[in-house]
A protein has these predicted regions:
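Entry/N-cap segments of selected transmembrane alpha helices
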Residues: 42-47, 62-93, 144, 208-239, ...
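Membrane-embedded alpha-helical segments of transport systems
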Residues: 80-88, 112-117, 133-154, 255-263, ...
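Hydrophobic alpha-helical transmembrane segments in multi-pass integral membrane proteins
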Residues: 28-29, 87-94, 148-157, 203-217, ...
């Protein structure tokens, strides 16, 4: 008996990404010990090695001529995402008494300015062009507390180690060298990009739990909607300004898991916001879960809209 698993996943918006991620989340929530038994089972929960392989594959699809375009797109999208989060946060702080339906400016800035790098790679790998995926070299900068600290006036405390930057760039450069030296190797490696998406989607899911969603409550879900929908629309427009299809912009409309630690990092610097940080942390966790669902749906929706117009988003203009 045959079960049409792939056809079912294809019918779900972002299904190849969302379903494995949700399965991983359910496993982490209800059967955490099963994932910690060791060996190859636990290895399936490690996203980093799979993402490293994906970086090499992405690099192999890029010609040296396309690299500056990817850097430009990544820079614009990163800047716009940062500016969007800061603008909304400052508006809430200045004109709404630092309270938007129970959400503080700290929570808004931390959630909206950070993005889930693994989710971005999976979605651009499935729906976007190689330039879209290559933009990750720059968009990776917003995965953490650095930009949030800048926004809150504490940039002197936060640093991004140079070695961390190199660790992102080197696998992509290795892939670029291989792909530019041998067209057959480029073609061979291109066949692997879509195959590994469900695997690191599952691994990303094992870093989330449904408890995060419950703890954040309705306000955390609203924060996720603001990040994915409002932020996503702005990012799609910004992406198109760079000559892109909008896929990279939609794929960047998430909240990074690392953002959950941002309020505590800020509170260590400025203890006066410790109370706000305690409330913001579960809200950001809920936003992470919410955007992990909404961002793939938004990206899939936009990809289908482009296809109806006769535009193939996987092909760069």
């Amino acid at each position: 008996m045959q079960i049409p698993i792939k056809k079912t996943l294809d019918r779900i918006p972002g299904g190849m990404m969302v379903v494995p991620l949700f399965i991983g989340c359910l496993m982490k929530t209800f059967f955490p010990d099963a994932l910690a038994m060791g060996g190859f089972v636990t290895a399936l929960t490690q996203a980093s090695p799979i993402m490293a392989m994906f970086f090499v594959i992405v690099g192999a699809q890029m010609s040296f001529k396309e690299a500056p375009k990817a850097m430009w797109r990544g820079s614009v999208l990163t800047g716009v995402k940062f500016a969007t989060g800061v603008a909304i946060g400052l508006f809430v702080a200045k004109f709404m008494g630092d309270n938007l339906l129970g959400i503080s400016s700290l929570a808004i800035i931390a959630a909206v300015t950070n993005s889930n790098g693994g989710l971005f790679l999976a979605l651009t790998g499935q729906y976007g062009s190689k330039t879209d995926s290559g933009a990750y070299v720059v968009t990776a900068l917003n995965d953490g507390p650095f930009f949030t600290m800048i926004a809150l006036g504490t940039a002197g405390i936060a640093t991004i180690p140079f070695s961390a930057m190199l660790s992102v760039v080197i696998p992509i450069i290795i892939g670029m060298i291989i792909g530019n030296l041998d067209e057959e190797m480029r073609e061979f490696m291109s066949q692997g990009s879509s195959k590994i998406i469900p695997f690191f989607s599952f691994a990303l899911g094992t870093g989330l739990t449904l408890k995060m969603l419950v703890a954040g409550g309705i306000s955390g879900i609203i924060l996720g909607i603001i990040t994915a929908v409002l932020g996503g629309i702005i990012l799609i427009i910004a992406d198109k300004v760079t000559g892109g299809s909008g896929i990279a912009g939609a794929a960047l409309s998430s909240t990074a898991g690392n953002a959950v630690a941002t309020p505590a990092a800020i509170a260590d610097v400025d203890p006066t916001i410790a109370a706000a940080a305690a409330i913001a942390t579960p809200q950001i966790a809920a936003s992470t879960i919410t955007t992990a669902i909404l961002t793939p749906i938004l990206t899939s929706f936009w990809a289908k809209k482009l296809e109806k117009r006769g535009i193939d988003p996987t092909i760069e203009k």
